[in-house]
UniProtKB/Swiss-Prot annotation:
The gene is SORL1. One of its GO terms (biological process) is protein retention in Golgi apparatus. Disulfide bonds join 985-997, 992-1010, 1004-1019, 1024-1038, 1032-1051, 1045-1060, 1065-1077, 1072-1090, 1084-1099, 1105-1117, 1112-1130, 1124-1141, 1145-1155, 1150-1168, 1162-1177, 1182-1196, 1190-1209, 1203-1222, 1232-1244, 1239-1257, 1251-1266, 1275-1288, 1283-1301, 1295-1310, 1326-1338, 1333-1351, 1345-1360, 1378-1391, 1385-1404, 1398-1413, 1421-1433, 1427-1446, 1440-1455. This is Sortilin-related receptor. Residues 1463-1555, 1559-1592 form the Fibronectin type-III domain. Residues 983-1021, 1022-1062, 1063-1100, 1103-1142, 1144-1179, 1180-1224, 1230-1268, 1273-1312, 1324-1362, 1376-1415, 1419-1457 form the LDL-receptor class A domain. Sorting receptor that directs numerous proteins to their correct location within the cell. Along with AP-1 complex, involved Golgi apparatus - endosome sorting. Sorting receptor for APP, regulating its intracellular trafficking and processing into amyloidogenic-beta peptides. Retains APP in the trans-Golgi network, hence preventing its transit through late endosomes where amyloid beta peptides Abeta40 and Abeta42 are generated. Belongs to the VPS10-related sortilin family. SORL1 subfamily.
Amino acid sequence: GWVSLNDSHNQMVVHWAGEKSNVIVALARDSLSLLGPKNSDVYISYDYGKSFKKISERFSFGDGNSSAVAIAQFYHSPANNQRYIFVDAFVPYLWITTDFCKSIQGFSIPFRAADLLLHSRNPNLVLGFDRSHPNKQLWKSDDFGQTWIMIQEHVKSFSWGVEPYDKPNTVYIERHEPSGTSTVIRSTDFFQSRENKEVILEDVDDFQLRDKYLFATKAVRLLGSLQPSSVQLWVSFNRKPMRVAQFVTKHPIKEYYIADASEDQVFVCVSHDDNRTNLYISEAEGLKFSLSLENVLYYSPGGAGSDTLVRYFANEPFADFHRVEGVRGVYIATLLNGSFSEENMRSVITFDKGGTWEPLQPPAETRYGEKTHCELSQGCSLHLAQRLSQLLNFQLRRMPILSKESAPGLIIATGSIGKSMAKKTNVYISSSAGARWREALSGPHYYTWGDHGGILVAIAQGTETDQLKYSTNEGETWKSFTFSEKPVFVYGLLTEPGEKSTIFTIFGSYKENGHSWLILQVNTSDVLGVPCTENDYKLWSPSDERGNECLLGHKTVFKRRTPHATCFNGEDFDRPVMVSNCSCTREDFECDFGFKLSEDLSLEVCVPDPEFAGKPYDPPVPCPVGSTYRRTRGYRKISGDTCMGGDIESRLEGEMLPCPLAEENEFILYATRYSIHRYDLASGLSQELPLAGLRGAVALDFDYEHNCLYWADVTLDIIQRLCLNGSSGQEIIISTGLETVEALAFEPLSQLLYWVNAGIPKIEVANPDGDLRLTVLNSSVLERPRALALVPREGLMFWTDWGDSRPGIYRSDMDGSLAACIVSEGVRWPNGISVDDHWIYWTEAYMDRIERVDFNGLQRSVILDSLPHPYAIAVFKNEIYWNDWSQLSIFRASKNSGSRMETLVGRLYGIMDMKIFYRGKTTGQNACIAHPCSLLCLPKSNNGRSCKCPEGVSSTVLPSGEVKCDCPHGYSMKNNTCVKEENTCLPNQYRCFNGNCINSIWQCDNNNDCGDMSDEKNCPTTVCDAETQFRCRESGTCIPLSYKCDLEDDCGDNSDESHCEAHQCRKDEFSCSSGMCIRLSWRCDDDNDCRDWSDEANCTMFRTCEASSFQCLNGHCIPQRWACDGDADCQDGSDEDPTICEKKCNGFQCPNGTCISTSKHCNGITDCADASDEQDCEIPLCTRYMDFVCKNRQQCLSHSMVCDGDIQCEDGSDEDANYAGCAQEPEFHRTCDQFSFQCANGVCISLVWKCDGMDDCGDYSDEASCENPTDAPTCSRYYQFQCGNGHCIPNQWKCDGENDCGDWSDEKECEGSPLLPITTAVPPTCLPNHFRCGSGACITNSWVCDGYRDCADGSDEDACPTSHPNVTSSPPAPRGRCSRTEFECQQLHKCIPNWKRCDGRRDCQDGTDERSCPTHSSLSCPQGYRCEDGEACLLATERCDGYLDCSDGSDERNCTDDTIVYKVQNLQWTADFSGAITLTWARPKRMSSTSCVYNVYYRMVGESIWKVLETHSNKTSSVLKVLKPDCTYQVKVQVQCLSRVYNTNDFITLRVPEGLPDAPFNLQLALKKEAEGVVLCSWSAPVNAHGLIREP
């Protein structure tokens, strides 16, 4: 259809209302730059452009005169598509409509509305800007423009905030200041109150808001200079405070232009003084920029290009830079080498978001099949017209590059091939996201597409025409359609935004009548035929076009209509997108800030940029203590890149380091197997250290001077180190020859690390780096050594040994000499040991007590007894600290009497080693300080020393008898001492043994990069899981087993494709060169389906079509039904060959034999002589609103009639679950019993746990909506009592007559309780039982008047009585009584040492010392397995399961077929795009792969019954498709070998991603009485939301 408007205005603005509305609004106006009076006309269409009605008479100034109205612009409400505002160009007047222009109201307003900004969610809220007013006023309307109030003046720019980054009514303005600069201000109440107004940045030149980013520029002036020396770019990400962005360049910066900020990364054009513009790219926060592309084309009205003709056509800056929509990471840019002319313009493209750029691949042939003779190697490529080309060719402006989300990978552009843009232009099309191009049309054209790219249309530019060209195969072939009775001079070709419709609108005029607007509409739906079926689609990925498996770390697969399938997708086609992650490769990384590619680009190595003056390896500022940062190796992952894993990632991504920590306070370090914590004694705060991969951390120590932590992992049998000052990351220093390291001790004076290698047994020593190692003691002295303590100043070493034959406390010099047992009586299971002031303290687990003795084994006494299971011990000042395995806590008490016992930390599951550190602990002298040795210097008693050589190092004996070591490799002799050579390599480099420095990326890559092979030594051997992975031959990389024999070289050496069985393709398949089979119809369709292009090789006019298709003589394929239908569908007309069609009619045959096209059947026009083609046409055609096609292809239904419980399709397909996708019935919802509370996550807990202050549900729902919220208790609910001061004590200490709490609260409310003493309240600024120093710091009360200056001002030792707290002495025993360290026998009142009490021997004549003794037994494990050392209870399933759970390894010894337990390892889960959960695991150790299978179980959290998902599978992965979206499940995998099932309680908890909600129900419509034509729609929420239903 066509409409002549009889309108001669020279501009027309058209708007589709959208949201499936048929309304189109058009404004015809004169350009404001033209001389003479101005007026305008408004037109509206209610039938989607078939007809237009002129409504200009409705726009008047209130006096009925509409001729003087000159509407400059109209605005459409994004919140309500029926609302429009029209604004006059010269008069402060506007018109509004809320019903698609059916009624229009005019209002005089107090300002000239140069710009309006309508709110995205509130349809009544509008901002208006008066640029013509001297004060640049900003106004606001709350009633859609009827009334206005002024909210700000001196406004330069304004914008709404963007949700969710801003509150709903946030407004940003850039306000002019008298200084000439601007201030950026944000307000959430339209500047009504000061508290809701915030200054974002001052002294700003320009400001811009882009979604999550804020950008501003500021000129920085030098002192004494009137000219700006440089311009700064300030950036805010996610509304954080604005910060200055950093650019690595030595050139002065003149201007910034934000080219793109759409993919969590910012492209910025930076213009320099010499008019050269470079393109930079940032990390996600937009603060650190690296160079991406030089000499990019950029125009600025006051800068680059302002002296060219472009200044007459462009008043805003721009860059020739296009983001290819629909795919990630693809951009096209224009390079400018010289002046602003097309001879100096070239196009380049990037597929990795600016990591690398390359010329566009030119097509090999023209559209007529002639060779182009354009080769990249000769500097010839394809160049595409962008903004500058359009402006330079102002008489015939070239169309911009067209790419849209509606058709991923499809690009149409105007361009030319050659060495620059200055060639004849044609239309070029790419179906591969820019990887390949073909010439589609000769000469410039208008173009667009519809039906999600299913149909392309074009019209020739610059001439009169009546022909519309269209293509249904992505521009491979074109047909023509006569759209007008006579030629039309075309101004433009448009379709509704979104490119989903098949209706196109042509704007033009008949030339002979002068300019008069003509609107013509073409509906191309008949061309596409029937709806597409699954056979009409194929899966396509942009990465396939590049020959890579992945782009930007993942493979995105789109469902795309095949080029030669002629069918329609439909407006509601929801294109499925599948995304899968990939392992990292070098292409996933770019050079980090401060680095650049080396001059030899083929190496792809990033090296430090000499122009960068910063320190790229330093920690960031700020770097909070307790957090970590990634120290660069010169590379950074491209922003938005999602790759994970692989050898390259670990080499390039940088090492994680803790933020530097300057230790000041005294603190405890304790290990809990899977973590190590730091407990500050002054503040009482506990903090987990940033460590990774801990499996069995049982021993630790700390180098206070260098701030380095050492720990041993008995599960991995390694010793590791992490320096908290940021000097290095977590590193393994010893990994060989270790077997159950149970103790570590760092010697700070000589810088030596000692450890107990209990499984061998040995006590060994090494330097801090672990490369100089020596055995000090072996099995000749040791039996089952456990703990170790050093006295460096005395040269002594003490350890505990709990072997069966000679348990005791031992002492030797630190070189292992003079070893002797100093305590052997009454010792059975000595655990921890600590030394303080010539006293040795140890925990005795069998006797359940803590004892002490002096260095000679004398003056032995029991400090505490009746302890459930003491383990590690430490001494600090006047107190002992220990942890207890049974009570899961760390305790403190007096080191002399055991009094004042208190709990410091509770709920410590798996608590192991513990040590205390403080400033001054490492000070002192010994013989090694004054007289060092050549390598290892071991202190001895009596101020002696022993020079030792590490194992494997040769030595010589000097005349003095001293041993001198030869310096090993990497050490050099200086002053008779072997000194480690300094590492002069950068952190991103590896130092070879020969001193060379190589890039760290080259280490362990199977190449001799060092020259001495040292970079390939000690490389970890990649162990691949034989059940799920394949190991590549050369690289050793593990790839999924599914990649084996898939006809793709995934390894790079083709080893994954060797020894594969030959595969025969079917008759309907094509065999690729690699052996892969693809559908025969995909041959020669211009898609790289074989991934080696063999399906597109030798494609000429000969082509094989499917059986359901007709093959034209030129080789093209068309649907069989198009042959002999009266239309020439083949370009050569061979489908209508009379010799074939005389016998056949594939269209509609009239009774007289005439064959007409199928499209002419039932089209409302009589074509047969007897009108039979329009008879029996009761079946309606599918429209945009009736777009559900029944399976029988005979009926069309509205989507509201599908899956509604009623069958409307004759074949019932509208209610078919598979065809229509109808949801299943919701399953039964589980409820808890009357004595339980049901958590929000479905878990049932005891009702008494509701509102008790503890998170028993795991999601805090049991503590929500409590009338009197309870503070979370710090004590165990079951076996501890919480004192009034917050301390925790065992329940049995309650009401025992002793002040265990310290505030007597444990003795309150006791039967017959005595009068309690009155205590003084603790100052409120410190914790209970803490002292407040004069400086305000808090210390524990026990440190006051203890002889140590713990407060910085010494106030804790002021006004103290004269005493010597550090001198330990026992008070004299009263006459007739034993001393405090003795036990008094009941008869004869004999005194014996208290350590002899309960030692199993009768020392009192009456035997009273062995009465009322605790049971001398280890832990009782009635339902599990007890370790042989008696120190831990295990579940029965943890015995012989392949993991060392006992510290003595007894749980994995003497395993038989009857006791062995098979457990899967590394059970993990991932969710894909569709919501399916993939479960993966590793085979158990020692398990046979032939007779054992896996059973997979699952249950929803809160359920007690496990459901079977999969049984008797030999795969180590499983896909869970039965789980409900947005629900939490527990999943476990059990092993079954023959008939035996190995039960396990090990499960993982996972949460299924949100899914699509069910359809809403109870849909109702009602007319709104007070508003004519308004329909109110209401509905009930779906039964199953499958997640959070969000607003669109």
